[in-house]
Curated annotation (Swiss-Prot):
<feature type="binding site">
    <location>
        <position position="65"/>
    </location>
    <ligand>
        <name>GTP</name>
    </ligand>
</feature>
<feature type="binding site">
    <location>
        <position position="69"/>
    </location>
    <ligand>
        <name>S-adenosyl-L-methionine</name>
    </ligand>
</feature>
<keyword id="KW-0547">Nucleotide-binding</keyword>
<keyword id="KW-0342">GTP-binding</keyword>
<dbReference type="Pfam" id="PF13353">
    <property type="entry name" value="Fer4_12"/>
</dbReference>
<feature type="binding site">
    <location>
        <begin position="260"/>
        <end position="262"/>
    </location>
    <ligand>
        <name>GTP</name>
    </ligand>
</feature>
<dbReference type="InterPro" id="IPR007197">
    <property type="entry name" value="rSAM"/>
</dbReference>
<dbReference type="GO" id="GO:1904047">
    <property type="term" value="F:S-adenosyl-L-methionine binding"/>
</dbReference>
<dbReference type="InterPro" id="IPR000385">
    <property type="entry name" value="MoaA_NifB_PqqE_Fe-S-bd_CS"/>
</dbReference>
<keyword id="KW-0004">4Fe-4S</keyword>
<keyword id="KW-0501">Molybdenum cofactor biosynthesis</keyword>
<dbReference type="Pfam" id="PF04055">
    <property type="entry name" value="Radical_SAM"/>
</dbReference>
<feature type="binding site">
    <location>
        <position position="258"/>
    </location>
    <ligand>
        <name>[4Fe-4S] cluster 2</name>
    </ligand>
</feature>
<dbReference type="InterPro" id="IPR013785">
    <property type="entry name" value="Aldolase_TIM"/>
</dbReference>
<dbReference type="GO" id="GO:0005525">
    <property type="term" value="F:GTP binding"/>
</dbReference>
<dbReference type="GO" id="GO:0061798">
    <property type="term" value="F:GTP 3',8'-cyclase activity"/>
</dbReference>
<feature type="binding site">
    <location>
        <position position="120"/>
    </location>
    <ligand>
        <name>S-adenosyl-L-methionine</name>
    </ligand>
</feature>
């Protein structure tokens, strides 16, 4: 097989791999405060994750992203990065992190071959940061960003989930922070995954509203740039080195060009973030430890069932009970 093609004719060249459901934060949009995590036997081993990645890269996937939970709380993560970075045909090995562990891990990750880092940063206010993350320390994340730049990472992007009443008023300040640090930043519409104990519809902030906030202070230039993910980009006329992205699952969904799949840490291959359609790869991995044929056949059949689009609603109703940390955030 040379290409993974789904039932809509879309080429799949991007796989997100969740290496853990655990996290040292409890972000309000990601999980419940009293989240219960998976027992070890239900979690894929690093060897199983590597095996899946190897199969997909051999079949045409060119970009892998390691996610969580927080991937840096998984023991052995640096060694996994080193092995994945060496896969023939892989062009990009990326990671999404909350940044709290990067003072320790930035240099080892860079040396292991990680090519890109996305770092979550929803606010620059320490008290708000603790409220959104429920227990996080902003200073650790800011130090982690510094450590990543010092380690040599040149392709660092900040991710901010924008919520009215929590951090929407900080959009301009976050842009200014990205400019000052020479970083890109993407603003994300909150996704209705899991019961998080509050009304999402009341805090929903669309990408168009975020763009309008930025345009009050900066002249924007639309860009046709693509990163292999769902973001639409603009450049700042006076600071063209900073790229601003908008990830808009509600207001400007990107389903028609969807090129990605997600593997959860329990081994479910999610065909769409907004649907429960999935393939139990863990069972196949453990039933066929020496033979890839059954896995390849099952993946090919599953791809034909990948939905044309999600059904997310900006009204805030939960369409998927699975939490974001269980989905590969």
């Amino acid at each position: 097989m040379t290409d993974w093609i789904d039932g809509q004719g879309r080429q799949i060249d991007y796989l997100r791999l969740s290496v853990t459901d655990r996290c040292d934060f409890r972000c309000v949009y990601c999980m419940a405060e009293d989240m219960r995590f998976l027992p070890r036997q239900q979690v894929l081993t690093l060897e199983e994750i590597e095996r899946v990645a190897r199969l997909f890269v051999a079949g045409g996937v060119r970009k892998l992203r390691l996610t969580g939970g927080e991937p840096l709380v998984r023991p052995g993560i640096v060694g996994l990065c080193e092995r994945l970075a060496a896969l023939p045909g892989l062009r990009e090995l990326c990671m999404t992190s909350n940044g709290s562990q990067l003072v320790r891990y930035a240099r080892p990750l860079y040396d292991a071959g990680l090519s890109r880092l996305n770092i979550s940063l929803d606010t620059l206010d320490p008290l708000r940061f603790r409220a959104i993350t429920r227990n996080g320390e902003l200073d650790k994340v800011l130090a982690g960003i510094d450590a990543a730049q010092a380690a040599g990472f040149r392709r660092i992007k900040l991710n901010a989930v924008v919520m009215k009443g929590r951090n929407a008023d900080e959009v301009p300040a976050l842009v200014d922070f990205a400019i000052a640090r020479g970083l890109d930043i993407s603003f994300i519409e909150e996704m209705p995954l899991g019961q998080v104990g509050r009304e999402r519809g009341e805090s929903f902030c669309s990408s168009d509203e975020v763009r309008a906030l930025i345009a009050q202070r900066h002249a924007l230039l639309d860009s046709a740039e693509q990163s292999g993910g769902p973001a639409r980009y603009v450049r700042l006329v006076e600071h063209p080195q900073t790229r601003i992205g908008f990830i808009s699952p509600h207001s400007h969904n990107f389903c028609a060009t969807c090129n990605r799949l997600r593997l959860t840490v329990e081994g479910r291959l999610l065909l769409c973030l907004g649907h429960e359609h999935s393939l139990d790869l863990r069972a196949l991995l453990r039933r066929h430890p020496l033979h890839d044929g059954p896995l390849l056949e099952a993946i090919g059949e599953a791809l034909q069932r990948k939905p044309a689009r999600h059904e997310f609603s900006a009204a805030g109703e939960v369409q998927v009970l699975r939490f974001m940390n269980m989905s590969g955030g």
